[in-house]
C-alpha cells in the first residue's frame, strides 16, 4: 500500500462523520502541508477535524505505527502536529464499570499494515484467522507461538467476513467483487461463486451444511450450497448486517437500515420481522442464548436488548457509556452477553449478566477501534480485533 494513502485510511477510521465541514482547512503549524496534502488526495480534511484525537505525540505515533512504517522524521512531524491540534476528545472516554470477573486481553499486530484487520474466527485446529479487508487477504495466527501467515485473495474481493468450515477451509464474503469465496489453506487455491448481490457482507454456516449471508447495500439475503454451488438470493429490508443461527435452526438477521430484526427460514428463505421500539433504532450484531432469546446491540440508541421470539416482547438496557456508546459486536457466552462500545475511545469491552442485570467493562488496550465482529472459541473465550490499528485479540475469561 502507498504510504501516504495508508495515512489517509488510518486517520479516517478515527472519525465519526465527514459531511459537515468538508472544505475546512487544517490549523497552521509544522506538518500542516504534509497532512493536508495527503488527506486532500483521498478525502476532505473534515475527516481529521472530526477525529477522536490523542493528547500526546507518542499516542498518535503508536496509532499510525500499527498502520504504516514511516521514517522517524516523517513520523515525528505527523505525530507532533496531530497531538498539538487534535487532542483527545475527552467526552468520548468510556464509563468503565468495575466488577469481580477477571479477563486477560492478548493482542497481535498483523503483518501487512493498513489492511483493516477484522472479524477473527477460530478454525477447527485451534488456529485464529482474520480478514484483511483493504488488502484483500486473510491470515492465520497460531495463538500459542504468535506465528502468522497471510494468504492473498483476489485483488478486488475486499473480504468483509470469514467463516471456517468443518474441514478447515476458509470462506469469505467478497464485499467488492460480488462473490462468496473459499480458500483451501493446504493449497492456497481459491474458489469463487458469483452473487447477484453486489456486496456480500456477513455469513454463517447452518447445521444443514449451507452457508447463509447478508448483503448490506444490496438489501439481499443469500444461501449457498457448497456441495453443488447452488445459490439462492432474495430481497429483504434495508441494510441486513449480522446473521446468526438459533438453537432451533432459525437464522436471525440484524438490520442496520431499519428498526427490525429478521427471522429467516433456512428452507423457504422467507423472513418474519420483529420491530424494535423507536424508529431510530439500528442493529448491527446479535447473538442467541441457550433458551433461544435473541440478544442485540441497539447501536443508534446506546442500548443492548433482548427479543423473546415466542412473544415478540423486547426489553432493552442502557449501555454504561450512554446514548452515544454505539454497541457494535456482540456474543453470548454461557448466557452472559459480551459486546463493545465502539463510540468510545478507547473501545470498551462490556460484560452484561442478565441474571443480575449488572455490567462490567474494560478498556481494550490498543483502543483505537473498532471491534466490528467477535467470535466465541471452543474454550469459551472471545476473539476480538481493532480494525483501525490492525490488531487481532484474544480475551481469556477467567
Regions found by a protein language model. Give the residues of each.
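C-terminal capping alpha-helices of c-type cytochrome domains
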Residues: 69-94, 382
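Electrostatic cytochrome c docking/interface patches
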Residues: 18-34
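Short loop/turn segments that connect beta-strands within beta-propeller blades
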Residues: 142-146, 184-188, 225-229, 265-269, ...
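The canonical Cys-X-X-Cys-His
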Residues: 35-46, 78, 82
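Beta-rich, blade/repeat-based domains predominating
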Residues: 113-124, 155-167, 196-208, 237-248, ...
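Blade-level signature of beta-propeller repeat domains, shared across WD40, Kelch, NHL, RCC1
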Residues: 369-398
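Gly/Gly-Pro-rich "capping" loops immediately C-terminal to redox-active cysteine motifs
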Residues: 28, 32, 44-70, 149-152
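Conserved beta-strand positions in repeat-built beta-propeller and related beta-rich domains
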Residues: 43, 129-134, 170-177, 211-218, ...
Amino acid at each position: 500500500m502507498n504510504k501516504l494513502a495508508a495515512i489517509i485510511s488510518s486517520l479516517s477510521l478515527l472519525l465519526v462523520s465527514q459531511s459537515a465541514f468538508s472544505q475546512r482547512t487544517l490549523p497552521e503549524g509544522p506538518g500542516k502541508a504534509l497532512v493536508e496534502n495527503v488527506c486532500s488526495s483521498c478525502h476532505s480534511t473534515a475527516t481529521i477535524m472530526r477525529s477522536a484525537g490523542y493528547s500526546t505525540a507518542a499516542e498518535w505515533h503508536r496509532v499510525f505505527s500499527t498502520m504504516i512504517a514511516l521514517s522517524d522524521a516523517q513520523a515525528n512531524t505527523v505525530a507532533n502536529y496531530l497531538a498539538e491540534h487534535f487532542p483527545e476528545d475527552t467526552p468520548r472516554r468510556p464509563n468503565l464499570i468495575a466488577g469481580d470477573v477477571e479477563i486477560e486481553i492478548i493482542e497481535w499486530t498483523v503483518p501487512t499494515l493498513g489492511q483493516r484487520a477484522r472479524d477473527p474466527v477460530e478454525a477447527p485446529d485451534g488456529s485464529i484467522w482474520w480478514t484483511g479487508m483493504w488488502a484483500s487477504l486473510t491470515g492465520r495466527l497460531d495463538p500459542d507461538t504468535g506465528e502468522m501467515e497471510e494468504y492473498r485473495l483476489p485483488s478486488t474481493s475486499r473480504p468483509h467476513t470469514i467463516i471456517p468450515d468443518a474441514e478447515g477451509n476458509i470462506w469469505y464474503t467478497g464485499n467488492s467483487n460480488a462473490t462468496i469465496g473459499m480458500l483451501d489453506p493446504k493449497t492456497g487455491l481459491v474458489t469463487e461463486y458469483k452473487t447477484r448481490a453486489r456486496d456480500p457482507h456477513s455469513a454463517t454456516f447452518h447445521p444443514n451444511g449451507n452457508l447463509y449471508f447478508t448483503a448490506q447495500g444490496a438489501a439481499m439475503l443469500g444461501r449457498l450450497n457448497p456441495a453443488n454451488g447452488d445459490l439462492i438470493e432474495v430481497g429483504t429490508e434495508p441494510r441486513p448486517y449480522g446473521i446468526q443461527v438459533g438453537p432451533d435452526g432459525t437464522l436471525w438477521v440484524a438490520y442496520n437500515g431499519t428498526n427490525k430484526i429478521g427471522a429467516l427460514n433456512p428452507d423457504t428463505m422467507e423472513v418474519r420481522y420483529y420491530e424494535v421500539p423507536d424508529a431510530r433504532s439500528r442493529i448491527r450484531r446479535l447473538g442467541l442464548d441457550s433458551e433461544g432469546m435473541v440478544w442485540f446491540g441497539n447501536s443508534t440508541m446506546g442500548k443492548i436488548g433482548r427479543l423473546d421470539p415466542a412473544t415478540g416482547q423486547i426489553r432493552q438496557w442502557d449501555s454504561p457509556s450512554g446514548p452515544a456508546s454505539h454497541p457494535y459486536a456482540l456474543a453470548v457466552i454461557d448466557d452472559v452477553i459480551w459486546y463493545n462500545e465502539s463510540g468510545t475511545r478507547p473501545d470498551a469491552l462490556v460484560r452484561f449478566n442478565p441474571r443480575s442485570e449488572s455490567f462490567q467493562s474494560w478498556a481494550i488496550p490498543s483502543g483505537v477501534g473498532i471491534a466490528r465482529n467477535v467470535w466465541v472459541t471452543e474454550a469459551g473465550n472471545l476473539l476480538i480485533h481493532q480494525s483501525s490499528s490492525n490488531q487481532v485479540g484474544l480475551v481469556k475469561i477467567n
